[in-house]
């Protein structure tokens, strides 16, 4: 009794402390559970400031043609959860920052209370599936998955029809940004939990046991034999997005023949490309553009829906009698001639060509995520939980690039066979469905013997670089993507052991030389003196798209480029005359990237102008070229290893370049420092970032092994960055190896409107207390011999007060230190006699470009 009373007394005395401790333990348990669900495969992904890790050696297997990698993080897309920085080394000082996370979803989402209306519909069994999916086997709600219309505001008052359990489903509901998407996810999960979504079994009609995987070898002797019977005709399905219209035209020019048909789907987000393709199609009777458009995201169910709808269109187009369906993207290119392809298919007119992953089906199912439930909405593929593969069939897959017979396409589109209907239902909720749907249907259909395990393509897989989970912002999975071909890969294009007629991927902004080599190999050289063979232009802004697609940084830069160019025209001979003075009118009408010999040459800005003297408005094109900024400083063997030192944004780890080619960045951007190295002795280098007022923003070490080619790191700097010229120094034992400068652009626009003084006061002031990191590195200023900051600090303070013309003058002056005017031309007649017509120059986007110009059909039915 005494002991019991003593215990009770202790409990009463410390009950508050005990309750607090229990609450903390409970909270920690919930946090651990939440992290395990959201970031199961990405430990350490905690927030914006992180300890860096070594470069990822790449994930995914070496299966031949599958894009799937492994299960990825389901991190936030629109909240504060970011992917980890890829790091080549370790910071000088470890920085830890607390991260404010959004409130996590509760463990369970309770169902909505049942309505009191007596006529409540009971969604169960097949009726439930039809209510959600629709009779055609696809989701209703218009074009669910293709994101029709503007997203609705987030509203957490959606009403699930069941109690939702499972970490994946709860994570998806917590991260979805619109009520519409949340409701769709809840509907799908409830049907799945009730067992009413997925088919339990699917009938198999193939008479062969096991997996069918025959192949065909390339035989030069047989290829030379004449074709018996009529030659086949091909329906090419071109699935394109982006803005690379010149590369698309070059592809079409290479594959075009008047006996074939070309059907082009342009992603709904690519309006500039759509306008260009519609204009192109008007000149050829056998080229058409889909009258409908979808948003086809990587790995999404919408891609399969697009293919099936396109196939139906092609079957029902009057006068289009074709024998084979071949899908291509704008990054493909032929490796053999049209004559060779037609002869080969004519000799194999009853075969379907699809590339399989191999023979390890269980591994493929896991790697591809076929045993997981996915749903597409808000341009994202959400992982919602696990599911079972239907019994009774062989599941196969591999590449989503294929060559299919018309009879098989008719079977897939028109049949009422339960095999196809139920597989459509299954693949509506599948990641990368186009990589498996046609394989699985064919291998279980009566036509299974027509399968050939070859899609007639060669793909440039480098999984060490291509499997870096670069699609985690689009899909809750880690996927892979092939690399672009370069001249050193040309031997891979010359396949001799198996028939290949196309290759991918090619990008002219990455390397155009390999296309020149391949084009010459197929069709011979262009006539001597043909212009622009080494030039490439790509539009990145068009007035018809409106300024909504431009960031404030780009809007600031493009308008400043126009002012700088017009000032140049007014002050530099031979243009420096009264009739060559112009004022810009409105925003630029277009902007192009310009490359020559696979090197970025700058921006081409087209601008409407008004002559200062009397006269009508004119349109000029201006060429702004970046200045070389790297300064090699060392003389040792280690210093000679440094090839380049760059700072930019939009780092592409697969191609190891900045997709922001001009390196334009503003105060709210998060720059990356990248170094390229030649082979040589191991070294450890220190990277130091210095802002315009000589504040040492950060410093960290990188380890460079003997065979390292590229190192890069994005330091987690506090924002906003101070505008002006920054310096990045590379040192070894505090002795200089190299140095570069980059510009943080002062913004003249904020939210597409002229910058106001109250916005400039914080946007251009740098981080609070000049603290870019939680730990100060200012102690390094003496070692680095930096000047005293007092004078530049006062100038920086005055800059925070600038708006209007004074702000534009500051912005123009900063840009002029990094960019120079390389050319100026007139699109039409000009009051300035010294201005050359753009079409007569070699650099203008309006200059001749024969390799990407289609022209009339020649006597042999071709364009090239």
From Swiss-Prot:
Q: Which GO terms describe its biological process?
A: chondroitin sulfate proteoglycan biosynthetic process; glycosaminoglycan biosynthetic process; heparan sulfate proteoglycan biosynthetic process; heparin proteoglycan biosynthetic process; proteoglycan biosynthetic process
Q: How is the cofactor bound?
A: Active with either Mg(2+) or Mn(2+), but activity is highest when both are present.
What does the PTM comment of the record read?
Answer: Contains disulfide bonds.
What reaction does this catalyse? Answer: UDP-alpha-D-xylose + L-seryl-[protein] = 3-O-(beta-D-xylosyl)-L-seryl-[protein] + UDP + H(+)
Locate the compositionally biased regions of type Basic and acidic residues.
Answer: 53-65
Q: Which cofactor does it need?
A: Mg(2+); Mn(2+)
Bilayer topology term: Single-pass type II membrane protein
Segments traversing the membrane: 16-36
Biased amino acid composition, Basic residues: 73-82
One Pfam family in the UniProt entry: Branch
Annotated EC: 2.4.2.26
Positions bound to UDP-alpha-D-xylose:
239, 267, 296-298, 400-401, 481, 504-505
- InterPro entries named among the record's database cross-references: Glyco_trans_14, XYLT, XylT_C
Give the EC class as a word.
transferase
Cytoplasmic compartment spans: 1-15
Annotated GO molecular function terms are: magnesium ion binding; manganese ion binding; protein xylosyltransferase activity
Please give an example of a GO cellular component term from this record.
Answer: Golgi membrane
Decide whether keyword Phosphoprotein is in the record. no
The UniProt entry lists the main location of this chain as Golgi
The family line of this record is: Belongs to the glycosyltransferase 14 family. XylT subfamily.
Please give the subunit comment from the record.
Monomer.
Question: What does this chain do?
Answer: Catalyzes the first step in the biosynthesis of chondroitin sulfate, heparan sulfate and dermatan sulfate proteoglycans, such as DCN. Transfers D-xylose from UDP-D-xylose to specific serine residues of the core protein.
Under which name does UniProt file this protein? Xylosyltransferase 2
Q: What is the lineage of its organism?
A: Eukaryota, Metazoa, Chordata, Craniata, Vertebrata
């Amino acid at each position: 009794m005494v002991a019991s009373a003593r215990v009770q007394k202790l409990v009463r005395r410390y009950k508050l402390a005990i309750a607090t401790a229990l609450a903390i333990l409970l909270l920690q348990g919930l946090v651990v559970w939440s992290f395990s669900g959201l970031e199961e495969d990405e430990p350490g992904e905690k927030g914006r400031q992180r300890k860096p890790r070594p470069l990822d050696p790449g994930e995914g297997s070496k299966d031949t043609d599958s894009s799937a990698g492994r299960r990825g993080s389901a991190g936030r897309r629109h909240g504060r959860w970011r992917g980890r920085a890829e790091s080549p080394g370790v910071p000088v000082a470890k920085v830890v920052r607390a991260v404010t996370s959004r409130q996590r979803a509760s463990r369970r989402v309770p169902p909505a209370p049942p309505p009191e209306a007596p006529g409540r519909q009971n969604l169960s069994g097949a009726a439930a599936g039809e209510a959600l999916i629709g009779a055609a086997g696809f989701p209703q709600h218009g074009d669910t998955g293709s994101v029709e219309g503007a997203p609705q505001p987030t509203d957490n008052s959606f009403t699930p029809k069941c109690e939702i359990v499972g970490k994946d489903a709860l994570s998806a509901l917590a991260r979805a940004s619109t009520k519409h998407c949340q409701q769709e996810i809840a509907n799908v999960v409830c049907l799945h939990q009730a067992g009413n979504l997925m088919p339990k079994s699917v009938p198999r009609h193939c008479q062969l046991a096991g997996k069918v995987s025959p192949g065909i070898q390339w035989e030069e002797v047989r290829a030379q034999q004449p074709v018996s019977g009529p030659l086949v005709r091909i329906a090419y399905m071109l699935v394109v997005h982006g803005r690379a219209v010149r590369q698309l035209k070059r592809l079409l020019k290479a594959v075009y023949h008047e006996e074939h048909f070309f059907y082009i789907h342009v992603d709904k987000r690519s309006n500039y490309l759509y306008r260009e393709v519609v204009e192109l199609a008007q000149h050829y009777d056998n080229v058409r553009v889909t009258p409908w458009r979808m948003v086809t995201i990587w790995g999404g169910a919408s891609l399969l829906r697009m293919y099936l709808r396109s196939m139906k269109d092609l079957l029902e187009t009057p006068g289009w009698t074709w024998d084979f369906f071949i899908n291509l993207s704008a990054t493909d290119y032929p490796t053999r001639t049209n004559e060779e392809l037609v002869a080969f298919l004519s000799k194999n007119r009853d075969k379907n060509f699809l590339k399989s992953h191999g023979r390890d089906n269980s591994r493929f199912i896991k790697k591809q995520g076929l045993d997981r439930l996915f749903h597409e909405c808000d341009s994202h593929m959400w992982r919602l939980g696990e599911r079972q593969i239907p019994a009774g069939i062989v599941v196969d897959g591999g590449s989503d690039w294929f060559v299919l017979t018309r009879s098989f396409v008719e079977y897939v589109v028109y049949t009422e066979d339960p095999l196809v209907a139920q597989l459509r239902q299954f693949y509506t909720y599948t990641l990368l469905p186009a990589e498996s749907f046609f394989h699985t249907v064919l291998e279980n259909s009566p036509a299974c013997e027509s399968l050939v395990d070859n899609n007639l393509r060669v793909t440039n897989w480098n999984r060490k670089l291509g499997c870096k989970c670069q699609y985690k912002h689009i899909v809750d999975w880690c996927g892979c993507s092939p690399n672009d071909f370069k001249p050193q890969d040309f031997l891979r294009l010359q396949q001799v052991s198996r028939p290949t007629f196309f290759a991918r991927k090619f990008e002219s902004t990455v390397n155009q030389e390999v296309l020149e080599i391949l084009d010459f190999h197929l069709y011979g050289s262009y006539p001597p003196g043909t212009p622009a063979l080494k030039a490439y232009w790509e539009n990145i802004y068009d007035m018809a798209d409106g300024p909504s697609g431009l960031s404030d940084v780009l809007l600031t830069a493009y308008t400043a480029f126009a002012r700088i160019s017009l000032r140049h025209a007014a002050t530099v001979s031979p243009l420096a005359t009264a009739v060559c003075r112009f004022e810009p009118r409105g925003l630029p009408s277009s902007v192009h990237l310009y490359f020559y010999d696979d090197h970025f040459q700058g921006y081409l800005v087209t601008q409407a102008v008004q002559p200062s003297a009397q006269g009508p408005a004119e349109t000029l094109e201006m060429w702004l070229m970046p200045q070389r900024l790297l300064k090699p400083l060392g003389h040792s063997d280690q210093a000679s290893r440094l090839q380049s030192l760059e700072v930019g944004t939009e780092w592409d780890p697969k191609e190891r370049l900045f997709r922001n080619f001009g390196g334009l960045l503003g105060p709210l951007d998060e720059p990356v420092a990248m170094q390229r190295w030649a082979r040589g002795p191991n070294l450890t280098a220190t990277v130091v970032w210095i802002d315009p007022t000589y504040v040492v923003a950060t410093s960290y070490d990188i380890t460079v092994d003997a065979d390292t080619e590229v190192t890069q790191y994005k330091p987690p700097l506090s924002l906003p960055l101070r505008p002006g010229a920054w310096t990045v120094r590379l040192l070894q034992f505090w002795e200089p190896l190299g140095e570069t400068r980059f510009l943080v652009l002062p913004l003249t626009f904020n939210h597409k409107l002229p910058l106001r003084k109250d916005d400039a006061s914080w946007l251009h002031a740098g981080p609070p207390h000049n603290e870019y990191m939680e730990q100060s590195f200012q102690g390094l200023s003496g070692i680095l011999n930096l000047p005293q900051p007092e004078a530049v600090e006062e100038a920086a303070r005055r800059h925070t007060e600038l708006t209007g013309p004074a702000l534009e003058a500051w912005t123009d002056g900063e840009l002029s230190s990094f960019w120079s005017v390389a050319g100026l031309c007139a699109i039409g007649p000009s009051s300035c006699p010294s201005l050359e017509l753009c079409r007569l120059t070699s650099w203008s986007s309006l200059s001749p470009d024969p390799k990407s110009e289609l022209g009339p059909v020649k006597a042999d039915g071709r364009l090239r």
